[in-house]
Structures are given as structure tokens and as C-alpha cells.
Amino acid sequence: MLKLFTKLFGTKSERDLKSIRPYVEKINLEYEKLVSLTNDELRKKTDSLKQYIKVETQEFIGELEIRERQLEATTQLTPKEVEDLYIQISRIKEQYNTQLEKVLLDILPQAFAIVKETARRFKENEQLIVTATGYDRELAITEKHIDIEGDQAIWKNQWEVTGHLLTWDMVHYDEQLIGGVILHKGKIAEMATGEGKTLVATLPTFLNALVGKGVHIVTVNEYLAKRDAAWMKPIYQFHGFTVACIEETSPYSAARREAYQADITYGTNNEFGFDYLRDNMASQQEEVVQREHHYAIVDEVDSVLIDDARTPLIISGPVEKGNEQEYITFNPRIKRLYEAQKQIVNQFLQEAKSQMVAGKNDEAGLPLFRAYRGLPKYKPLIKYLSEPGVKQLLHKTENYYIQDNSRMMPEADEPLLFTIDEKHNTVELTEKGLEYITQQGEDPDFFILPDTATAVGEIESDAGLDNLEKEQKKQILAQEYAIKSQRIHAVQQLLKAYALFEKDIDYILVDGKAKIVDEQTGRVLEGRRYSDGLHQAIEAKEEIKIEKASQTYATITLQNYFRLYHKLAGMTGTAETEAGEFYDIYHLDVVVTPTHKPVVREDKDDKVYKTVREKFNAIIEEITVLANQGRPVLVGTTSVEISELVSKMLNLRKIKHQVLNAKHHQKEAEIVAEAGKPGTVTIATNMAGRGTDIKLSPEAKAAGGLAIIGTERHESRRVDRQLRGRAGRQGDVGSSQFFVSLEDSLMRLFISDRIAKIMDSLGLKEGEMIQHSMITRSIERAQKKVEQNNYAYRKRLLEYDNELNKQREIIYRRRRDALLGHRLGAEVNAMLFEVAKSSVMQQGVKANYHVLATKFSYITGTLPPITEEEFHTYDIQKITDIIYQAFLSSYMNRLAVFKEQGIAVQMNLPDHIADIRAEYLSFSFSDSERRLEVPVKIADFMDNAGEAILKSLERVAIIYYLDRYWQEHLRYMDELRHSVQNASYEQKDPLLIYKFESYALFSTMIARANESIITYLLKANLLLYKASDEKPKMVEKNKRIELEESKQDIISLLRERASNSSEEILKPQPIKSQKIANRNERVTVQYEDGTIKENVKFKSVEEDIANGKCILLETR
């Protein structure tokens, strides 16, 4: 059916290209019209397009300005009126963007033609002479390729790029125009190596820069950002666009802010993301560097949106107390445990071998399976599994023990100290293992968490204890629980470090530090640390300095950062295999762009060997033959360890070669430049696959082109395609060949027994191999399975992060409005009402008078304006209005007080205050609990002292308390995500519970922040003031926090934490223990407004519970 559909309507790529080719024809028609124009006339075309865009979108811009003025002008808007205005503004912005995209599509042919004609003129002329503009004169001061002679500007076609003088020699061809259209439409363009992605990006960049809202071009490393910016910027600058690279500026600096104000901004994905987080930690408006996120083009988009999907950007600071000592204390025990397990596994392996030799295959199955469960990567075991019939026996035994929900598995695991599930990358300590690490004389429950529910019940029912003694005992129980929880967590992480993470594969040691190696690229991930204490465990294992634990202050995933953009596009050489994921998660369509010249590279079927030793011997022979033929050879490896192994084997043969891996990355540019010469052998991890272009010498082409040798298949087809793509660029000859053994990880875990049976039946001798298209297809099917599993994990993680992202958007919007001084009156008014409402209501029902009186007195320092009798007589709405009016009256009194104090300060200021260097007056406020420094601009203060003081205090208090509670909330959310994983053991969906609990937690956090802000505003007193030429930071007096930026790998929490069945974290208040019922059970629920529904079926309210609209009280 699919074949018939394809035959009738063509492939997706054919249909995509059919819709794009008309644009190419229009672009070329416009291009022909431009040839006769002078250089000045060509430049004026750009100005006319800018003007056209303004005219066509002016209606919506005018409406937006009216709505914004309404928000700014009115301070007494109700929360409902503010929300309505936000909705109107959002709707107008959507209409504006729709109109804008329509206009841009209309002028696309003209804009693309201008870029192409500019490129042609630079290629065919050594210099372009134009009438000098002010911008030309400004550029000529710093740019060597621009000269000013009288009223003329002379643009040369040579300029410096990363230290080398480059002569422009490129003009866009039709396939690149196709790529440009794809990128402008907000899609992903898959373009083969050497097809000129950097040049393609100039087309949509130019078109979208006409809008004036900024275009961000995102690269995967600093070198590419600087190179591409320097390489392409003269094309843009010639037409009056400003171009900057954020990598050439410092964070927080005025230069960084100016870089974002440029029409076109280059930078790395990490730096764009970190700047967003820094902006949302800024204490002054001048510290904010980014502006609206309008349009971004992401280079190597699959690397950013898929490979880095589990990697959040984090800004963190120190915590008061770390747990480094736990890892130091228990490391020797886990090391002994791991060595003891090795001996046990070796004994089971020898037993299995003996039974097999004796022909007792049935008896050999269990010890073989136990060895596999104990240490699946144990090299003697892997070697033995390549023997005829052994792997089939292992799978047969495994199937027996996993049947009936793994009912028999405890019997198989009983002699082991810990078990490893290699497919899910988890490890779990057994009861025997717990006994092993518990030392003599220690409490037998030293590593077992207490049953708190039972213990609390016993304390409550103990009639011999008074209330104070009960509280003391419960406090001791909670402390014991926390200590044991931390201890067990350290042991679990140490066990993972020993059992699941290998040096020179997962990480390397450099200068006494453990640095993570990216499995996709082979590069060192500078600044990234494994999360949840795992990195500290690895440091303890390697006996290097254990870095201190840190607290998260701000975090965002790259995926959620790029979702901020109105329009997002991407480029890569390998996206088609992940097209489904791009569309499902990011709504990005993948379009394959045709190559300029046909690809003539020969991709050979995989060569499959029985053992790793035979495979590597064959690889060395192949390299020798190819190098002797004068062909350059690129050997792709999956880890640092394998690259060094191949290097040693080549040294024994005295074959000259270069090694490019995470340990030798400094020489990357130099090694790649030499890799295309005849007979050159280059060994590289996957890091040679991106951002590099191996150009062949004429002699190398004549010898047969670049030969790619893959030492094993990667889990991802994309990585293999990246490696193949190094050869055959721009129609060059070349070849690719993968060598595989049955001992490779992918083959062991995911290839069916069928291939092993075939090889056994063929009776292959030492060094012989099989090579067939059927085998290659079977391997690719296995890769698809792994990709599907990884996609499921990434999607699940994204679903968790989406909950936090919704909360982040709310907090950051409120914080940004406060920082910029937008709608402060409306914001404070809304908080006054919410705090009044929460003072009257508790858990959705009317509070008692004592609670109301206590809270009102704490917030205002006065008695409530309502008696207990009135409280019981009036309804909730009336009481709320009374309390709100009292809060509002108190707030207006503060304004009057500050006005009087401000006038007094004004009278004491020197007459020449406006002439001195100071820009701010710094006021100190205190509510007897906390002291804040509040900067007030002198100009605002002199104009209206009281209002200037109050507005500045509002801004400082809102930002201070939002930051304080948000940072605390981030820690709670991380602990929540950890703790809900145990719900899977109760057949409950952890994500559903996480959504419900996180909503309750966020609501409580917002309520606490609002109350703290209002309390401070109503109680804080002015202490002193001073003139200052610096903008004070909004932190507590004498408190300065050193921040650090990092990328932490959350390593698929669902996978990593699945092994922690015995581990449970005490959830911080106010998380409520949420019950979950069966769908047909009768339940009682309470809604936010206090309404209680009794005896309803759980399935009828399940959605409301998931959305946080109600809470489950009991089941029947």
C-alpha cells in the first residue's frame, strides 16, 4: 500500500521539493533583474524592502502600542482586567506574526536575489565601490577590507577569517536556494557534507533581519561561531546590517548587550541559553542583555535538540552543607564489594564452562546467566559468548527467569552482591550485598530506611508521652530518616560509578578532574557534571578531589530555551532518521535538500566477525592496504579507549597516523587539515563528524578518495551517517566500510540469535567473516530499536521538564516586569487581593478567626478590622473585601510616609546633587527580619520622592522574594521528581503524580512569595540612605554569592533511578501525600473553591486531579 501511494504521489522529499522549486525560479528571475543595477542601487533595494515590511505591519504595531500604554498608565487595574489585556496583547502579537510571515514570503524572491547578486559581485570583483554612508565610515575604522576615499567606500573581496586571509569565491546555486527557503519556513534542512550550509544560512538570515527584531545563528562550538561570523558578515554589512558574535564578549557586559542589539547575532547554544538564565537573575535593568526571541537558525540541530535533550543548562551556587564525606567514607566498602562480585562472576563463568564441556547444557544455563547478571561487560564473559551455542543458551535461560513478571528472578540473583540490567543501564544492591557492606558491630539496619509511617503511628498512640515529647521523638525520627537516606543515596551512586561507568569511555581524567565524554561526538563536555551526586561518586572512585555539592539557582533545557523563539529552523547533515521525533516534540518538519552533484561514495555492507580480536586485526590489514594505495583513511571509533587501542596496533606496524579524541582535541583543526592528503591515516572518535570538512588533494582523489572505516556500529544511525558523510563531499569519490563483531555492545544487546546461529552453522575459522546486505539490514533494525527506546526516554524527560517550564515562564514574566518597572501597581494590587483571599481561606474552606487574626497581625503589625462575631456572620466574599481594603489602606499609608521621608531627604541633599557623579540614592530598608538595599534613580527621586521610593522598594522586594522562593522551589521539584519514581512499583504513573504534586507545590510557593512580598512592603522601615555611582545589587546586606554555570547530565532519570527501589526521599513540605485510586473506585474529592464531591467514580475526576483542580481526600 505504501509503495502504491509513493508511486502515485511521490516520496515526501519529492513532494516537498515540488512545492519549493517555484520559489527558486522566482529568485533567479529577480536575480537577472539585478545585474544591471549599480552597487548603490543594489543597496537601496534593501532599504525599500525594510520600508515595505513596516507599512504592511503598521496596523498591528499601532494596536500593540495602545494596549501596552493601557497597562502602563493604569495602576488600579483588577487582576481580571490585567489578564484580559495580556490576552489581547498575545492575540495581537499572533496576528502581527501571521501578517509578518505572509509579507516576508512575498518578498522572499527579491531578498534572496539581493544576497545572491551581492555574493556574485564580491566573487567577480576585487573591490566594490559605493557612496560612503555613516555606517561605512564607522566600519572602516575597524575593518581592514573597507577603505574610505572622499565620499566613496571601497569594499575589498578579501577579509580575515580566524587569522587567515580569505578571498570570497562563492555564489549560491539552486540547491542552496532550496535550503534557504526551507530554513525561512521554519523547517530543518538536511544537507549533505560540503553542500555549504554556512552560505545557505545567509539567505533566510538576510530576509528575517529586515524585520529589525534580530536573527540568532546558533552553532555547537565557539570556533564555528567566530569563524562563521567573520566569514559571512561583510555580505550583511554591505547592506547596512549590524553583525556580532557573543563569544567575543563577556557575560553581563555592555558589549554583550550590544551584540544582542545587532541585526544578526552569532553564538553557541550554551551561551545563548546561559544569557537567558543570567537575564532572569539580573538585579538591574541594565544587566539584561537579550531582547525578544524572534528567529533562530540552529546549526547541527540534531546534536542540540536530540543529543543534548537530557542536558539542562544550570547556574548554581554553593550550599551550606555538602555530603562529600559520605562518598569518601563508603568508597572503600563499595570498591571491595565490586572486587568480590568479580570473583563470584568468575566462579560462575568457570562453572558454566565446565558444564558445557561435560555436555550438560541445561545445568550450564543458570551459572552463565548469573555471571551475566553480575557483570555483563566482564571481558572473559563477552569472549565466551562468541563461542558456538553459548549466546543462545544465555537467551534461553534469561527468557525462563523473566517469564511471569520475573517471578523466578530472585532465585537467580540470590548469590550475587548486586545485579546489573545492561539494557536499562541500572544496578541494584541485593540483600547479600547489603550484608556485605554492613560492617561488624554496626546496626543491621545501617543501610535500611526506617518505616516512618509505622513509627509515627506508634509515637502517636503512646499514651505515656505528652505532646512535646511526641514532637521531639518525631523530630529525631525525621533526622534519622534524612541521615540514612543520604547514606543510602551515596552508596547507590558509588555502586553506579563502579558498575556502569568506565574510564576512557564515559569519562576521562584530565589534570585531576573527571570530565564527561559525549558518547555522540567523542568530545569532552567542559563544565558538565553528572547530577544527583553521581559525579562526586566517580571522583571518589578515581580517588581525586571531590568537588563540593551545589544548589541550582536557575535552570532550563536547550529544548525549552529554543521554544521561546517565534520561529525556529535548523540545519544538519543527518536529520531524516529522527524526523518523527523532530515533528512530534518540536513541530519541526525535516526536508532533505538535493545535493549539487550526485553522491558517488561506495557504502559497503558491514563485515561481521566473531570476536573483537579478529575484527581489529582485519581493520589494521584494511588500513595498511588503503594507505599503501595512496588513499587518505579516516578511522572512526566510538570511544577514547578504542581510538588508543587502534593507535597502539598501528604503531606496532609502524604506520604513521594522527589521533583525534577527547584527550587530543587541541590539535583538531591541524589534524583535519592534513586528513585529506594521500596515505594519511587519521583515527578519530565521533568528534570528527561535525563542523569539519575534509578536503581532498588531487592525488588523493585520483587514488580513490577518502576511505572511511568504522570500528563498530553506534547505537544511533545518525552517528554512523555522520561518519560516512565525511567522504564523498561535492561529488568526490570515496568509500565507507563498517567492521563489526558479535562481542560489540550493540550486537550483544540487540541483535537476534539468528546471526549467531548463521555464523555457527557456517563453521567460520579464525579471522573469517560474513558480509551480506541481510546482515547490514538486521543491524540497522537493531539501531532503530535502540533509537525508539532512547526517544521514549527523551520524550518522558521532556514531559517532566514541561511542568517546570510552565512554572518558569510565570515566574520569569513576573520577575522581568518587576525588573523593568512594568505594571508594578497592578502587580502589587493583585498580590494584595490574593494575600487577603488566602488569609480568609484555608484548603479551599473558610479559616477560623484565630488564624485570620494571627496572619493579619503578622503582615501589617495591627489588629484585623473585623470582630470574631462579624467573621462568623459575614460570607467569605465580604470578609475578603474587608481584609483587602485594609491591606490597600495600609499600603497607601506607606506611600504617604515615604513621601514625607522623601521630602526630608530632598531637603538634606546638596543643591548641586544633579551635577555630581552619583546616579543613584541607595536606601536601606528593614522589617526587623531582613535588610535590603534599594537603589533609587536620583532623577526619579527629585521628581516625585515618595512614589520613587515606593516603586523601587516594590521592584526590589518582588525580585528578592521571587528569587528566594524560586531557588528553593527548584530544589523541591528535583526531590519530587526523584521521589515519585517509586510510584511505578505500586502500578501508578509517576508523571501523573508529579504533575499533581508539582502544581500544589508551585501554588504554595506563589502564595508564600506573595505573602512575604506584601508583608515586607507593609512593614519595612527606611533606615538610611547614601549617594552612589554604582548600582547596588538586590541581595541581603553582607551576602554575596559566587555563581557558576554548568551543564548537568540528568542521564535519563527514569532509567538511572529505577534501581533505587529501596531509596526514598522525605518530601519537603508542603507536598501532600496524594492517593491514587483505581478507575472504577468510588472516591471523595475537594475542589479549589472548597466544593466537595462524594461517592464519585475516580475516572470521572481523574483529569481534574491531573490538572490540579481538585485533591483526592479518600477512597471507598
Swiss-Prot record:
The GO biological-process annotations, alphabetized, read as: intracellular protein transmembrane transport; protein import; protein targeting; protein transport by the Sec complex
GO MF, one annotated term: protein-exporting ATPase activity
**PANTHER family, per this entry?**
CHLOROPLAST PROTEIN-TRANSPORTING ATPASE, SECA INNER MEMBRANE COMPONENT OF SEC PROTEIN SECRETION SYSTEM
Record's function text: Part of the Sec protein translocase complex. Interacts with the SecYEG preprotein conducting channel. Has a central role in coupling the hydrolysis of ATP to the transfer of proteins into and across the cell membrane, serving as an ATP-driven molecular motor driving the stepwise translocation of polypeptide chains across the membrane.
Q: Which GO terms describe its cellular component?
A: cell envelope Sec protein transport complex; cytosol; plasma membrane
Q: Which residues bind ATP?
A: 176, 194-198, 693
Q: What is its EC number?
A: 7.4.2.8
Q: Which UniProt keywords apply?
A: ATP-binding, Cell inner membrane, Cell membrane, Cytoplasm, Membrane, Nucleotide-binding, Protein transport, Translocase, Translocation, Transport
Specify the species: Amoebophilus asiaticus (strain 5a2)
Q: How does it assemble?
A: Monomer and homodimer. Part of the essential Sec protein translocation apparatus which comprises SecA, SecYEG and auxiliary proteins SecDF. Other proteins may also be involved.
This protein is called Protein translocase subunit SecA
Q: Which family does it belong to?
A: Belongs to the SecA family.
On the tree of life, the source organism's domain of life is Bacteria
